[in-house]
């Protein structure tokens, strides 16, 4: 099921507001996930996971790029994210629960940075968007 037009518009407006800082916010979300859910670090043992590390920033930018791709292709997330899904599910064998945990952290981060804008409507739209992204990424796990 695709996102409703109002949800798509709300998510796109948030992305526009975040602008060139999407990578910064995605990095913060990763750092939150690593600190709050240490089991997720299992997939990153080869990286320096300290706060502010260049390796976490680089991966945060990859997350940001993937989410931006998703925002640009809201009408067909499974197709847009197919290569990413294949890599994470088939090659890296990421536990789908980790997508949920990152999704939670991706929700908390803009709420912290944009408290005046983080209305119940924005919250709901972002939850729906992240749920669709997670579903598209984890669909091969079923």
Curated annotation (Swiss-Prot):
One of its GO terms (biological process) is cellular oxidant detoxification. Pfam families: Globin (PF00042). Heme b binds at residues 59, 88. It comes from the Eukaryota. Keywords: Heme, Iron, Metal-binding, Oxygen transport, Transport. GO terms for cellular component: haptoglobin-hemoglobin complex; hemoglobin complex. Residues 2-142 form the Globin domain. The keyword Iron applies. Disulfide bonds: none annotated. One of its GO terms (molecular function) is iron ion binding. Belongs to the globin family. This is Hemoglobin subunit theta-1.
């Amino acid at each position: 099921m695709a996102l409703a037009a109002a949800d798509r518009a709300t998510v796109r407006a948030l992305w526009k507001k975040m602008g060139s800082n999407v990578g910064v916010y995605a990095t913060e979300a990763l750092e939150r996930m690593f600190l709050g859910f240490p089991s997720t670090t299992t997939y990153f043992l080869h990286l320096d996971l300290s706060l502010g590390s260049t390796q976490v920033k680089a991966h945060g930018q990859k997350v940001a790029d993937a989410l931006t791709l998703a925002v640009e292709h809201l009408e067909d997330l499974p197709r847009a994210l197919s290569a990413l899904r294949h890599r994470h599910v088939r090659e890296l064998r990421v536990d789908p629960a980790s997508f949920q945990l990152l999704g939670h952290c991706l929700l908390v981060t803009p709420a912290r940075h944009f408290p005046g804008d983080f209305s119940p409507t924005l919250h709901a739209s972002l939850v729906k968007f992240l749920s669709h992204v997670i579903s598209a990424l984890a669909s091969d796990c079923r």
